[in-house]
Amino acid sequence: MTHIATWKGKEIAKSDRTLEVDGYVYFPRDSVRMDLLKPTPKTANDLKCPHGVQFYDVAEGTRTSQRAAWSYEAPQAKMKPVDHWIGFWEDVAIS
């Protein structure tokens, strides 16, 4: 099944190799418009995450959705299959 991530009417990810973990769909990086993702500074809560989470703002021009994407940079066992893959939430629609 092909999944598509859409943000403000723009397709930002598309793949038939997605994985679903804990209700979230994760996309391989090579299927994501990484030019629209801007890494955010790590918060104290981010640093407590056992999976080494990195959040991203989704941004283009003057439009930004803060921390609307993330990846696990050093995942523990359960999240290992989505190591460095991108998950979306907030106002990013997955179909």
Language model feature labels by segment:
Residues M1-S95:
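Terminal leader/tail segments of proteins
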